[in-house]
Amino acid sequence: MTAAFFAPAAYYSEDWKLFQRNEWMGTTGKQVNDFKDMVKAFHKENIAVIMDVVYNHLSEYEIGNLKQIDKEYYFRLDEKGNFIAQSYCGNDLKTEAPMMRRLIIDSILYWMKEYHVDGFRFDLGKLIDWETIESIIREAKKINPNVVFVCEPWGGGYDPQGFSLRGWGAWNDQIRNGIKGENPNDGHGWIFGKWYGNNNIDRIKSYVNGTLIKDKHGLFQKKEHSINYLESHDGYTLGDFIRIGTGEVKRDSIINDVDKNVKLSAQQEKLNKLAALFLFTSQGITMIHSGQEFARSKVIPKNIDVADPHKGMIDHNSYDKDNETNYINYNHAEINYDLLDYYKGLIELRKTYEAFRKAEYENINFTEVPDNKFALAYSLKYNGYEFLVMFNACQNIEAKFPVAENHWEILVDNKKAGTKSLGIAPAEIILSPISGTVLKRIK
């Protein structure tokens, strides 16, 4: 998207065996029909297509682009005529320029009309000026009143509230850092029994509620504006963050056996499950990254024919790698099948019971947990159902929660998750370190 704003990349539609460097690709136009067929196939399964778009900077490698047409008009420059690069990608587009704004809007409308895309996720959304954002909303809704807009609410600033006021969803990096942490070496979050930055139990409760502005440190007007996530294309995968965070793998370790590295230890599996349970039971929109459900690991292959001082190590910034570092190895789903099955159960739970998506703020009630600052418990009600959700993120002590005996059935524990009963809850729930549970009231 940073080169051709109106065309799908032919590379992903070509037979890679016929790929030749320094030769034109996509001359048959096959990629256009392939993309349209893909959208049709998703729509047939009632799956919306949200496309990642980049309108804040331009590719550094394309010939005949806007740099050659009119650098001063299309780009933000400093007083010496150099590119401003708050995107950290070499240049920032001047989205406020009328013809740049028109290009962006025309591109959005084209993807909606020609390819029937249902929505867009904007890279570094804060680098796009508000007038352009509002024009996009106005014009796109003429085509589809239900068009979806999501963004990274940073880049040249940080303003999730500004996007929420305009009806956009935004990636919630606060829940990401608060729950997981920011750095696997010395910036651990709640699942590790730590407070990252200015996080505390009240912020954790706010994340459960959808990080709403009615809470002291909230960001969003509506819970559906909070895109809750713990892993994306940037940074370590959640699985690798936990591998390094436990100290079982070093950041600069050379991985000689990738399959062995992928296999989760008991401690790593508990942390992955606790993180997933919090993510899927929090109000807002749940986002997971490809392979997160089986703790995918990004290991740079040793046998690549390019110079890389980090060969054999876990990668934390793999944007530039078209090799096994970024390929999804589904054999690893079998290696960590218990985690995969846990994710499947949590997805089923969230889809079946709307309480985990639509519970009103007033119907989520927290219970104080004495003597364990990393334990959390709350009840939620919606549409005739009532649930108890309990967590113990402490690393070394149990958490005890009294409940009414014979009134609750267990749907999630530290091993299984889903909608089938795992048994009747006793009068006291005892959670071992790094675990959680979900109970449903028996009608």
Where are these regions (language model features)?
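Short loop/turn motifs at secondary-structure junctions
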Residues: 115-116, 384, 430
